[in-house]
């Protein structure tokens, strides 16, 4: 499988899909964001449970409930985006800065994000997403939600 990088046509198409997906999150438009998913999407999100997929997939109502937990738009800034793509499969990783007022407090969180995409009927769709934060390895089992990129 040949991996294509450096603003290839496929990478440009993928970036367009991702930008529209992220804008759906920022503007709290569940239909727009979810239109970029495969029908069998599997997600490892920050929120429980351990896995979303199959009969336990995140639905439109769950997405809207999360969106509506924010007052106003959601800050969803993507940093250090890296994409690798073949003609039909791609993956990307980045850091995400999530911010806003999530009732009743401010949210200011950096987390890691990795996703896999598949080209289906000529369109790039998100097939898998994985969000994570590191944990302090001091025995506290506390998530390191205070970290910021250097």
Language model segments and positions:
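Short, low-complexity N-terminal intrinsically disordered segments enriched in polar/charged residues
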Residues: 1-40, 144-150
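A short, structured loop/turn motif at beta-sheet edges
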Residues: 83-90, 105, 117-125
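Hydrophobic/aromatic beta-strand elements that line small-molecule binding cavities or substrate pockets
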Residues: 63, 78-83, 96-98, 112-118, ...
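Short aromatic-enriched loop/helix-cap "lid" or pocket-rim segments at secondary-structure transitions
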Residues: 46-48, 138-142
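Short, well-ordered beta-strand segments in beta-rich or mixed alpha/beta enzyme
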Residues: 21, 33, 42-46, 90-100, ...
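A solvent-exposed, acidic/Ser-Thr-rich amphipathic alpha-helical stretch
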Residues: 12, 30-87
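Short beta-strand edge/turn micro-motifs at domain boundaries
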Residues: 110-140
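Short, cysteine-centered beta-strand-loop-beta hairpins and adjacent loop/turn segments enriched
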Residues: 99-108
């Amino acid at each position: 499988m040949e991996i294509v990088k450096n603003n290839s046509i496929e990478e440009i198409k993928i970036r367009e899909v991702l930008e529209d997906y992220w804008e759906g999150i920022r503007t709290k438009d569940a239909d727009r964001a979810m239109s970029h998913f495969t029908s069998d999407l599997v997600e490892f999100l920050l929120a429980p449970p351990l896995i979303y997929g199959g009969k336990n997939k995140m639905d439109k109502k769950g997405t809207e409930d999360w969106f509506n937990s924010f007052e106003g738009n959601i800050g969803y800034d993507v940093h250090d985006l890296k994409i690798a793509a073949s003609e039909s499969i791609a993956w990307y990783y980045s850091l995400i800065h999530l911010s806003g007022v999530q009732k009743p407090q401010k949210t200011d969180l950096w987390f890691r994000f990795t996703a896999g995409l598949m080209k289906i009927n000529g369109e790039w769709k998100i097939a898998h997403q994985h969000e994570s934060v590191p944990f302090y390895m001091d025995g506290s089992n506390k998530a390191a939600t205070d970290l910021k990129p250097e």
